[in-house]
Amino acid sequence: MKTYRLSASGRRTALILLVGALAIWGFALWSFRSTLGIDYNPLAFWGSLRASIENGLGVSQIVPALLMLVLIVATPLLVWNLLEEWSAGYTPTSEGLRFQSLGVGVLYPWSAIRDVRRVDDDGDEPLDELVLQGDYTGQIKNPVLRFLHAQAYGRTTLPLYAGIEERQQLLDEIRTRAGLEEPPSTEAT
């Protein structure tokens, strides 16, 4: 059984995106602190936040603080998605397609794969996803990992990233084993 993983180029791209996401998260933390004038010391945080609120916050403080708060909460979810993409492995087996990444292991039976849908038709690096008949995230025992995986991928889809080595071979094997039709050719005649 062959396991398909990200190519070196795909890993570099994921690493660049990961560094960018961490930089955005650091900027959001710094901006949130400076906008509200609070202290991140755990012993002084609530007191400094309370003092800032009691002094009154203007719109010029509230709007950027809320935007930074959204980034502070959402960026770790993006980081998880990038890390899960970084270590993703797709293994076709006789039972179905096994997906493994960062402690997540899910087996998608061939009969559960309804379609392979093109999400991004970029000529150089197209992105496809498997459309599934149901939710198979229940196979993930850890509830935190199950939540993070569902946030990253959804419950009824599984992306097949553009940077996967021998990606077309994986797509052909999935279509053959799942009994799916080949997509219409997009080449000009």
Question: Where do the protein language model's features map onto the residues?
Answer:
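Conserved beta-hairpin
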Residues: 71-117
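N-terminal membrane-targeting/pre-transmembrane regions
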Residues: 1-63, 183-189
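Short regulatory "switch" loops immediately downstream of catalytic or recognition motifs
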Residues: 29-40, 119-121, 132-141
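Canonical hydrophobic alpha-helical transmembrane segment
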Residues: 23, 59-79
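Generic detector of contiguous secondary-structure segments
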Residues: 11-23, 108-121
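Generic detection of short hydrophobic beta-strand segments and adjacent strand-loop junctions
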Residues: 2-6, 108, 155-162
